[in-house]
A protein has these predicted regions:
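Compositionally biased intrinsically disordered regions enriched in polar/charged residues
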Residues: 538-539, 546-549
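Post-transcriptional modification and biogenesis factors for structured RNAs
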Residues: 511
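Low-complexity intrinsically disordered segments
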Residues: 499-502, 514, 538-539
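Nucleic-acid-interacting cores, centered on viral/eukaryotic replication and modification enzymes
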Residues: 1-508, 547
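Cationic, low-complexity basic patches in intrinsically disordered or flexible, solvent-exposed regions
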Residues: 507, 516-532, 544, 553
């Protein structure tokens, strides 16, 4: 079958995939199934040659169609496309491009054929002549003049294309020859995987360079968030199996996608106001030219008013609940929200979790901390050191709990998780302890660790997305209307004098009954909290719900 026909079938599959309602299912099917359809094709053709550029462009457009649908963006920046093609362990989405796989797949298949065919068919001596080993090809490439062709012609077309593919790989990742020369590569799959790892690492360095070029020196939030995203290889690579791993709301998954690709979640073309802290869009970050309110959701995550609101209910509490369930599965006894756990220390301190091994005398006191690498205090170090925000959060927790817990003979663990998904050292140690308590063999420990990390990371990403949606800035016009509503609800001529002449007030002033009512004694107005119930209930949209919360905050503050 021609290559173009196979790619046309892949295009039809991606077109059908777009009809799936759940966009998490779209991503998983594309990442786990459709992307791998061309893997065996690329092992049999020199896909890195210029003759396949048109087919490669068609295939990459199909793969990126999933990203465009999820992010509702017909045009993607070059950095976002590069991030989407990276593996999930390097901060990407795992949607592999044609060029990132073609040369590695062809060289791996050729190296296996050149090694196995002469051994399996010793009577066919021409195989050894027409299929020289990759070491022979590398020696010919090394003896060639820089910028020129090899001194000896290739004995076959396959050897010719293999030498060109190997030259392209060496130009991108010089360690490819050492991988080919090693003796532990038993299958083409394993060899292709190891070569692709080298290429991905070089692509990762290029992506980091592009991100650093877009950042500012005072507030490098892109690098900080990308480093945190690199600590989460599970969220966009996990097949939904249960309630914890299934994301039913497409809007939450779209926010997670945009954060992963460093794309704006909602444009900030007009004046906006944070519904939680009421900061306006013209305020700037200290010691920086960047604005506090941003279209990427950073302020929504670390807003000071959100730490005790949506950030706790949508992010912190679900992580505590999932972590408790994981520890219970490992056989530990778990208590939630345990107060007065300290024998020596300030009374009233409440731990998120208190776990104990069966038959053990020591308790494990766990306090979960959510950290954001994009805050003004952490952003510069987080852009240089992955996991810095989680490390600082653990230090703060240890200062608060550590010496008191150690004095009473128990063990304290500060479970810190960043907004991008990176975990602190204490969190990793706790999950390793639970995995060892659950199973004895290496396979059981690895399976439990994967199970636990999948649920922790997905819960974190979903909690961050819901926090952003709950605190996303609303239009400044809505705040003006809120102030007008507040003025209507308060008694007295001082508040009424500042009201704008809306349609309802004009009807009131122009009505015939107004002349008879203005001579009557003024009736006592009820409290503003009572009149809140007379307002029409807002529609179930994000901005109107945020407007309703802003109304209640304004009424309570006055």
């Amino acid at each position: 079958m021609p290559v173009s026909s196979i790619v046309s079938e892949v295009e039809r599959d991606f077109e059908v995939l777009g009809r799936v309602r759940n966009i998490q299912a779209q991503h998983i099917i594309a990442c786990k199934s459709l992307v791998h359809r061309i893997n065996h094709l690329l092992r049999n053709i020199p896909g890195g040659e210029s003759a396949f550029d048109e087919v490669a462009a068609r295939y990459d457009a199909c793969v990126l169609s999933v990203v465009r649908r999820v992010c509702s963006s017909p045009l993607l920046p070059d950095t976002a496309r590069r991030i989407a093609h990276l593996p999930t362990g390097m901060g990407g989405l795992g949607l592999r491009s044609w060029k990132s796989t073609a040369d590695a797949a062809f060289v791996a298949a050729y190296a296996n054929a050149a090694k196995v065919l002469p051994t399996l068919l010793p009577s066919c001596a021409y195989f050894a002549k027409r299929l020289p080993t990759t070491q022979t090809i590398h020696g010919a490439l090394s003896s060639a003049v820089p910028g020129g062709s090899s001194t000896s012609p290739a004995p076959s077309r396959l050897a010719f294309f293999a030498s060109r593919a190997l030259a392209r790989l060496n130009s991108r990742a010089p360690g490819v020859h050492e991988v080919l020369r090693s003796r532990d590569n038993r299958t083409p799959n394993h060899l292709q995987h190891r070569i692709t790892e080298l290429i991905d690492y070089e692509d990762l360095l290029l992506v980091k360079g592009e991100i650093e070029a877009q950042d500012t020196e005072e507030y490098p939030w892109r690098s900080a968030l990308f480093n945190s995203n690199c600590g989460d290889p599970y969220t966009f690579n996990t097949v939904p199996k249960d309630k914890t791993t299934t994301i039913a709301d497409n809007r939450d998954f779209a926010v997670m996608y945009s954060r992963r690709l460093l794309l704006p979640i909602n444009p900030m073309s007009e004046e906006r106001v944070c519904p939680a802290c009421l900061v306006t869009s013209d305020k700037r970050v200290r010691e920086s030219n960047c604005f506090v309110l941003d279209p990427y959701g950073n302020h929504c995550v670390h807003c000071p008013k959100a730490s005790s609101g949506a950030r706790t209910s949508a992010w912190h509490d679900p992580v505590v609940r999932v972590l408790g369930d994981i520890l219970k599965m490992a056989g530990l006894k778990v208590k939630f929200e345990e107060a007065n756990v300290l024998v020596i220390g300030p009374p009233g301190l409440r731990a998120d979790l208190v776990a104990s091994m069966p038959g053990g005398s020591k308790q494990i006191i766990i306090d979960v901390r959510t950290a954001d690498p994009c805050t003004a205090e952490n952003v510069k170090r987080s852009a240089q050191i992955p996991g810095h925000a989680a490390c600082q959060a653990e230090i703060l927790k240890k200062k608060k709990w550590g010496h008191f817990v150690n004095a009473q003979g128990d063990l304290f663990v500060g479970f810190a998780v960043e907004a991008g998904g990176a975990l602190g050292d204490g969190a990793k140690s706790l999950l390793d302890l639970a995995a060892c308590a659950n199973g004895s063999s290496t396979a059981e420990i690895a399976a439990f660790t994967t199970y636990a990390l999948q649920r922790i990371h997905i819960t974190t990403q979903l909690g961050v997305a819901r926090t952003i949606r709950a605190n996303f800035p609303i239009l400044g016009f809505y705040i003006t209307r809120v102030q007008s509503i507040w003025g209507m609800l308060l008694p007295g001529p001082a508040s009424a004098s500042h009201l704008p002449r809306t349609f309802s007030t004009e009807l009131y002033h122009n009505s015939s009954n107004n002349k008879h009512m203005q001579h009557k004694p003024r009736q006592q107005q009820p409290e503003p909290r009572q009149q809140l119930f007379l307002l029409p209930s807002p529609a179930l949209t994000t901005q109107l719900l945020a407007l309703n919360r802003a109304v209640q905050r304004l009424l309570c503050s006055r």
